[in-house]
Amino acid sequence: MSFSSDVKEELAKQVSKSRHCQLAELAGIIELSGRINEKTKGLELDTENLLLLNKYATLMKRAFGTDTTKALDEQDTGKILAALKITAQPVNRQTADGLLLMQTCCRRAFIRGAFMAAGSISDPNKAYHFEIVCHTKEQAKQLQELLCGFDTDAKIVERKGHYVVYIKEGAHIVDSLNIMEAYVSLMKLENVRILKEMRNSVNRKVNCETANISKTVNAAVKQIEAIRLIQKMRGLDDLPAQLREMALLRLEYPDAPLKELGGYLDPPMGKSGVNHRLRKLSAIAEELR
């Protein structure tokens, strides 16, 4: 499976318990992948993607008690579209009503639905690229504003009659996965990103021995992964002051050896002391896994 498929598989398993978030996510799906059947006048999805169809079916069942294995009639469709504030046709060229996006959790859900319906993300080992393809400029602008509201650098480009909302910066793609709550995929991408940054930095340090470089990189990656996990699951502010200081230092200087890290402390600390604190952080992260 591709990395993009892995992300969607993870998102497909997430179903909000709140109906308002379910409606927001459905709006994101329908407004980019929905259509009205000309014969039955019922709502359906214009896709063969099983992950999307299953997620759509689950959300429709939770939010409306609707069985999507049976064709929706015009009356049921009208009720559903009214609840989703979709009042015009075609349904896949509308923008979301602001009432559906008033809460932060609902904005996250809408973005998640839009990505499930029309998004993709490249293999981070090859390139950094996140995108969602919209039918109209208005849809793209709304989605861009929502993503930028979470401090991502989302941009728009026109491509073959569609409007593509995209993100190229690796850190902002990590943020987009966080927005959609794809935490497993986030950690995978973050690990790749850290490795790339570390290797780029290491390549500039021509006086280092290859074996020591590999050992330092691998150890630092594991340390940063542990700190990121603590940050996501618990928050660094909850740590004892000494461990919080060490965690922040490791994040600020991802490629620094233990001796250099110790020099940034006040008073300075030796390699063994730095290593002891980093091991404590790793132990905390292990308990959270």
Which stretches of residues belong to each language-model region?
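N-terminal low-complexity or simple alpha-helical regulatory segments
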Residues: 1-85, 89
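Short, hydrophobic/amphipathic alpha-helical patches that form generic packing surfaces
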Residues: 24-32, 109-117, 248
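Short acidic, hydrophobic short linear motifs in intrinsically disordered regions
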Residues: 39-43, 125-127, 257-259
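Short, solvent-exposed alpha-helical "recognition" segments
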Residues: 278-289
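Structural motif
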Residues: 15-23, 100-107, 237-241
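Extended mid-to-C-terminal alpha-helical interaction segments
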Residues: 181-279
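Short acidic (Asp/Glu) and glycine-rich catalytic loops that position anionic groups and cofactors
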Residues: 36-37, 123, 156, 204, ...
